[in-house]
Amino acid sequence: MAPGGGGGRRDGWPARGRLLLAALLLLLWTRAASGQSSPQQSVILGMRLASCNKSCGMNPDGIIFVSEGSTVNLRLYGHRLGEISSNLISFTEVDDAETVHNSTNCLELTKDLVVQRLVNVSRGNTSGMLVVITKFLRRSENMKLYALCTRTRADGPWLKWTDKDSLLFMVEEHGRFLPLWLHILLVLVLLVLSGIFSGLNLGLMALDPMELRIVQNCGTEKERRYARKIEPIRRKGNYLLCSLLLGNVLVNTSLTILLDNLIGSGIMAVASSTIGIVIFGEILPQALCSRHGLAVGANTIVLTKIFMLLTFPLSFPISKLLDFVLGQEIRTVYNREKLMEMLKVTEPYNDLVKEELNMIQGALELRTKTVEDIMTQLHDCFMIRSDAILDFNTMSEIMESGYTRIPVFEDEQSNIVDILYVKDLAFVDPDDCTPLKTITRFYNHPVHFVFHDTKLDAMLEEFKKGKSHLAIVQKVNNEGEGDPFYEVLGLVTLEDVIEEIIKSEILDESDTYTDNRTRKRVSMKNKRDFSAFKDADNELKVKISPQLLLAAHRFLATEVPQFSPSLMSEKILLRLLKYPDVIQELRFDEHNKHCTRHYLYTRNKPADCFILILQGKVEVEAGKENMKFETGAFSYYGTMALSLAPPDRSPAHPTPLSRSASLSYPDRNTDMTPSSLAGSNQFGSCILGQYVSDFSVRALTDLQYIKVTRQQYQNGLLASRMDNSPQLTLDGCATCTENLSERPELPVVDETTTLLNERNLLLHRASQEGTI
């Protein structure tokens, strides 16, 4: 068997290939030179380390080293290795790796390495496992170097391999550096420290600084004491984390080394350290500290501080770097949803009763719910028409409803123009049949509108400001082809918001439903019935009530410019209204509806009076097309008849008049009703100092109205001037009259044109209502 070179490293395959190629060329050259044919021989090309039962490996130079007293498996590569026996392979001792190539003769074979057998030969006879047993070195020796020797036959000469891949170091086995009892004790101590560091890492880092503050304020006395100990070092989160991790890694590494030295086998040392660290260093301590982290952390605070001090040179700079890169530690902060869910999940374990939990939940949901979620739908609201008369029937309906704030609508329920408070009716007599507008405009309560997406917390703040405890919910409707408009959806009250907070319904004697959503009705046990107190249908009211007189007085003083306090004092106006024949009644003849006495004004006939309808309905006919429409109470006509137009002013060119006679207040942007349209337009003309109406007004029902003639009005103006200037004598009446005639003229309007425009507006609105 001839040596052909070899190598024992994976990265030495190119060198071995070159050696193999050189050996084959040398073999062929030898055979060709001899000219003789010889039988094919076994060839060893290389050797490498396969395994051993003790520490072994390869040094940086590629030389195999093994421990003394171990069994080593060497992998051989070559040709026809199945024909090689153990007596053809041996080792010889050499001085050093540098001089091994000086000689190829194996002068003396060593007995320190015993070649056992060649096993596991491959099917192609190109590789096999050589088992070698190493003996112990002498006391004075700590290392020996051996070279591989082979021969071709049992009686042939030994040849020494000269490359480094065929060398083998045998080193002294290192013994334990500590006594066995101390070694075992140190392993146990390190195992305990590993568990402490692992448990503290989980227990302390799981304690949020915010949670520690909460425990300090509301925990038990023991918990407060523990929290006060832990909180200072827990604030230094990254520093504490780095110290615990460095200590844990240091202890686990030391434990592995000690176990390797104690057991001696690499696999057993790794398995033992893994089992010990996992069970006693991770599972048990973390299971304990996850439940009692506060107590464990407080009782081991001294040990933690010691390790923080010992690891300060390394852990503190790393913690500062983490603070710079990652920023400050993000503390646990519960938002609204998480806090609410935490209360629900922990309900079986906390001492909160269901009502308290509902209140907390309701308060937390204020910012997530809108007024549309809790409002009362518009069709379910109790409302009053703006043209309602506060008679006994209306008053009884209001009292039976039980509500203290009632919306007032005009034309349709979505057009809310006022709010009526029940306390406003304290001095209203049902027998007076006072118009509702008189009351609402006298108190002029603000109407509070909110959008449907307003959050409940914002709505509560608005209610707390004291503006109103009732709001109208609206939204912008931009559906369809027309312009966007505000659509009223319903009402929301302070009671609705409070009910949403406490998650319970507040029922009183006025509630009709227990809930706006379920629409479950309340049983009315104590509901009062006022039907027995209502007036008979055939009962007539001959005289005007004081309340109606007051309403007419206030209406004339505030809505009709000719009776404003700047022209006629309120005292004189009241005296004028109490003058005989100023307030009149007209009985309607059902059998002769078009009789002459039903006409208050006749087209193209002179008239010298002003008329204000108090009760009843009239029909107005105007324009070339003879358009007709109906008006009711508090519509007025003939303001131009109260004063003569100047001679130099043509009726065909009137002075423009601002529409200040509307029944709506100036600061409101509301639609006009037919009554307000009729009352806000005075139509007629002045011909030769005499007022001639170009319209007709005919009664449709029994009427009660105020009729003021021109002479009565002029006398009232004169009386007001004399009342304001009591120093004037009778001799100064002429001067007073002159001054009166020189007073600023009230502007007039083209009444027919105005009437036509208002009629078109009424027809357009009626068509819209029919479409809806």
From Swiss-Prot:
Keyword Ligase on entry: no
Modified residues (Phosphoserine): S658, S662, S767
GO function term, MF aspect, one: magnesium ion transmembrane transporter activity
Protein encoded by which gene: Cnnm4
Renumbered residue ranges of the record's region Disordered: 647-676
Family named by the database record: Belongs to the ACDP family.
InterPro entries in UniProt: ACDP (IPR045095), CBS_dom (IPR000644), CBS_dom_sf (IPR046342), cNMP-bd_dom_sf (IPR018490), CNNM (IPR002550), Ion_transp-like_CBS (IPR044751), RmlC-like_jellyroll (IPR014710)
Miscellaneous remark of the record: Shares weak sequence similarity with the cyclin family, hence its name. However, it has no cyclin-like function in vivo.
Subcellular location(s) per record: Cell membrane
Bilayer disposition of the protein: Multi-pass membrane protein
Record-annotated membrane-spanning stretches: 176-196, 262-282, 291-313
Residue intervals of the CNNM transmembrane domain: 176-356
Gene3D superfamilies: CBS-domain (3.10.580.10), Jelly Rolls (2.60.120.10)
Function: Probable metal transporter. The interaction with the metal ion chaperone COX11 suggests that it may play a role in sensory neuron functions. May play a role in biomineralization and retinal function.
Tissue: Present in spinal cord dorsal horn neurons and in developing teeth (at protein level). In the tooth, higher expression is found in the ameloblasts during the transition and maturation phases of amelogenesis; reduced expression in the odontoblasts.
GO terms under cellular component: basolateral plasma membrane; dendrite; neuronal cell body; plasma membrane; protein-containing complex
Organism per entry: Rattus norvegicus
Record-level GO BP terms: enamel mineralization; intracellular monoatomic cation homeostasis; magnesium ion homeostasis; magnesium ion transport; visual perception
Complex formation: Interacts with COX11.
Protein name: Metal transporter CNNM4
Keywords: Biomineralization, CBS domain, Cell membrane, Glycoprotein, Ion transport, Membrane, Phosphoprotein, Repeat, Sensory transduction, Transmembrane, Transmembrane helix, Transport, Vision
Ranges for domain CBS: 375-436, 443-509
List of glycosylated residues: N120
